[in-house]
């Protein structure tokens, strides 16, 4: 008797899992919403921490405000941070 209940429960769980398999999305940025300007300024701060005196953080933050967060800098992408680097 217990074996039949276990098998029935297992089958129900598998059917429920397979029925919902294609509908699950795990993207917290979309689920909670995000502000591109906030991400832009946070990335400027992160790049400043990583690159120190070689990175012009205030200039980066000003560009975030000027372009309303449309040009988000990526610290590991030279093309996106090139305008904010100085030669020392």
Curated annotation (Swiss-Prot):
What GO terms describe the biological role, i.e. biological process, of this protein? ecdysis, chitin-based cuticle; neuropeptide signaling pathway
The answer to whether keyword Transcription applies is no
Q: List the disulfide bonds.
A: 40-64, 44-60, 47-75
Which coarse location class applies to the principal site listed for this UniProt protein?
secreted
Q: Which residues form the signal peptide?
A: 1-26
Which Pfam families does this chain map to?
A: Eclosion
What are its GO cellular component terms? extracellular region
Q: What GO molecular function terms would the record report?
A: ecdysis-triggering hormone activity
Supply the InterPro entries for this chain.
Answer: Eclosion (IPR006825)
* The keyword Glycosyltransferase is annotated on this UniProt entry: no
State the compartments where it is located.
Secreted
Highest rank taxon of the organism: Eukaryota
| Alphabetic keyword roster | Disulfide bond, Hormone, Neuropeptide, Secreted, Signal
Query: What the protein does?
Result: Neuropeptide that triggers the performance of ecdysis behaviors at the end of a molt. It triggers adult behavior patterns: larval, pupal and adult ecdysis, and plasticization during the molt.
Family (UniProt): Belongs to the insect eclosion hormone family.
**What name goes with this protein?**
Eclosion hormone
Organism, per UniProt?
Manduca sexta
């Amino acid at each position: 008797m217990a074996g039949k209940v276990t098998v029935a429960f297992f089958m129900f769980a598998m059917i429920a899992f397979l029925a919902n398999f294609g509908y699950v999305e795990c993207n917290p940025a979309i689920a909670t919403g995000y502000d591109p300007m906030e991400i832009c300024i946070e990335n400027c701060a992160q790049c400043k921490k990583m690159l120190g005196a070689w990175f012009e953080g205030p200039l980066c933050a000003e560009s975030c405000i000027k372009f309303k967060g449309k040009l988000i800098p990526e610290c590991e992408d030279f093309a996106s941070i090139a305008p904010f680097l100085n030669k020392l």
